[in-house]
Amino acid sequence: EALKAAAGDDELVEIRVLPTRYPQGAKKQLILAVTGKEVAPGARTGALFNVTTVYSICRAVYEGLPITEKVVTVTGEGANEPKNVIVRVGTPIEQVLDFAGGVKEETCKVVCGGPMMGVAQGNLAVPVVKGTNALLCLTDPAPAAEDPACIRCGKCMDACPMGLQPLNLYRYVNCGDKEELGRLNLEDCMECGCCAYVCPGRLPLVETFKAGKKLLKEGKR
């Protein structure tokens, strides 16, 4: 309601309320939800910006200011005082955690980003960058894969928002078949983690697909 009030009668602004659904914030999913049009694999889309990016563009254009600070959410069971903090870009992650009250002794991992697409940090001396939006402090170690072999149950295919075939992509990455990876549109994978989340064997699907994308890039050089 506040956004609608701020937009007023401006014909160039339309406020659309969408249901909370992961990963609806991704570019292609957002276009489908708002316009009803599906973006074909490999096709280009229009320019989409989140609120933070729009704010940064406004400051750059009207005030001549670069991105110098970020709002970072410190959260998770391992965080002593979960909170949002305004952080200077370049600040080491360990200093951000200390400022936010530190972490508990049982914290085993700090993830930069969210629980589904975040990346575990092996070194907390690395700096906050313009893409840093959250620090997730975890106390439970990730369960290891029960069996490295895919049982081809198909749950990953049902979960994939891009309509890909994770079970086949997993196999072709492991055998290095670039032709099949290209045919099955591996590059359309957004690494959302939905497939890994539902996998009963806890296979490292996202990590495998990242390696597969590197394999395809190397083949294009």
Positions of PLM-derived features:
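Short glycine/threonine-rich loop-to-helix capping motif typified by GTGT followed
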Residues: 1-6, 120-127, 200
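Hydrophobic alpha-helical positions that pack around
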Residues: 1-93, 99-106, 114
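Generic beta-strand/beta-sheet core signal
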Residues: 18, 75-77, 88, 111-113, ...
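Active-site gating/interface segments in enzymes
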Residues: 21-25, 30-37, 101-151
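Conserved active-site and cofactor/substrate-binding residues in soluble primary-metabolism enzymes
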Residues: 48-56, 69, 80, 88-91, ...
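A glycine-rich, aromatic-flanked flexible loop/lid motif
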Residues: 64, 70-72, 120-134, 159-160, ...
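Structured core elements
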Residues: 73, 84-86, 95, 111, ...
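Ferredoxin-type iron-sulfur electron-transfer modules in oxidoreductases and energy-metabolism complexes
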Residues: 134-147, 157, 161-221
